[in-house]
A protein has these predicted regions:
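C-terminal motif of bacterial Sec signal peptides marking the signal peptidase cleavage site
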Residues: 20-23
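Active-site beta->alpha N-cap acidic-glycine motif
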Residues: 83-176, 180-183, 202
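Acidic-and-aromatic substrate-binding clefts and catalytic sites of carbohydrate-active enzymes
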Residues: 130-133, 152-160, 183-189, 215-221, ...
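N-terminal low-complexity, Pro/Thr-rich disordered segments
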Residues: 12, 25-114
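His/Asp/Glu-enriched short active-site or ligand-binding loop at hydrolase and phosphoryl-transfer sites
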Residues: 210, 220-256, 289-296
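CE4/NodB-like, metal-dependent polysaccharide N-deacetylase domain
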Residues: 27-29, 142, 147-149, 173, ...
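Structural recognition of the beta-strand scaffold that forms the well-ordered cores
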Residues: 123-127, 148-152, 173-176, 212-215, ...
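Bacterial N-terminal signal peptides that target proteins for export
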Residues: 2-12
């Protein structure tokens, strides 16, 4: 009997161990299944780092947006609707006043203007060169809805005249700024004539309208420059009163834009910031952007 009892106890212990081992094996299988399921699910998205674009430039998301119903990602990136990319940054202007044309003295030389002599509450935006062609310019011009004059250099634009054609179609007026962007001051008559007349002729061929105004590179000119501008059929040489670069407006006189001032900026990397800064300076002075060509007969 004693042997039988001991044998029964050993059998019971053995059966208990088998049950424990089976339970452990089931737990391990469950853990492996859970791990496999976790690795098959989408990885957690890491938040994108802040944009390195210059301020003022619209940045479209690199990640597709979710549909309103909470479904899968849409096929295209989420972009602002047309006409709203710069909403909130562009000042609003009313219609400019009916222009009062200035008196241009007669003679054998073109007048030299850095300001239009007018009491009307207007200022003029001019943009030079054309080396850097920011894609935002077209939408910016459309949204702002203000007149601008582009003084273009042939060598800067000849690789992509279609870019400037689109700006012209949006309302910009194209003027001349030489072929090669060399300083004209002190150069021979023949050199200046080639640069001044040649640039106007080529721009007329490219864009269907010959320029009526001219700006020498760096604002540098001499008596020959003004004489050749006149001989080439253009009405005036242009300088400026304010410049804009990297979103900062710099004034030659005082700390505000004055009625009739000509503002200079360039086609640069910070084009958006510069253009908006020019508009904000005009608005802060209580003025309205107007078209330069409307004031020069």
């Amino acid at each position: 009997m004693l042997i039988g009892v001991r044998t029964a106890r050993r059998l019971a212990v053995g059966l208990t161990m088998v049950a424990v081992l089976a339970a452990c094996d089931d737990s391990a299988k469950a853990g492996r299944s859970a791990a496999a399921g976790a690795s098959a699910s989408p990885a957690v998205s890491v938040a994108p780092s802040p944009s390195t674009e210059a301020p003022g430039q619209p940045v479209s998301s690199a990640q597709p947006s979710k549909s309103p119903g909470g479904g899968g990602a849409s096929a295209s990136p989420s972009l602002p609707p047309p006409g709203s990319a710069y909403q909130g940054r562009l000042p609003k202007f009313g219609k400019p006043p009916t222009p009062h044309r200035i008196n241009v003295p007669e003679g054998n030389s073109a007048p030299w203007l850095s300001r239009i002599p007018t009491d009307q509450p207007v200022a003029f935006i001019t943009i030079d060169d054309g080396w850097i062609k920011r894609p935002e310019a077209l939408e910016l011009f459309r949204e702002a809805g203000v007149p601008v004059s582009l003084f273009l250099t042939i060598n800067a634009i000849k690789d992509d005249p279609a870019y400037f054609q689109r700006l012209q179609d949006a309302g910009a007026v194209i003027e001349a700024h030489t072929i090669s962007h060399q300083s004209l001051k002190g150069k021979p008559y023949s050199f200046q004539r080639k640069e001044i007349c040649g640039s106007a002729d080529q721009l007329g061929q490219m864009f269907g309208k010959r320029p009526t105004l001219f700006r020498p590179p760096f604002g540098e000119k001499d008596a020959t420059t003004l004489k050749v501008i006149h001989e080439c059929g253009m009405k005036a040489g242009l300088f400026w009163k304010e410049t804009v670069d990297k979103g900062i407006v710099r004034y030659q006189e005082g700390k505000t834009v004055q009625p009739g001032d000509v503002i200079l900026m360039h086609f640069r990397d910070r084009f958006v910031d510069d253009f908006i800064a020019a508009l904000q300076a005009i608005a802060a002075a209580g003025l309205t952007p107007a078209l330069l060509e409307d004031y020069i007969p």
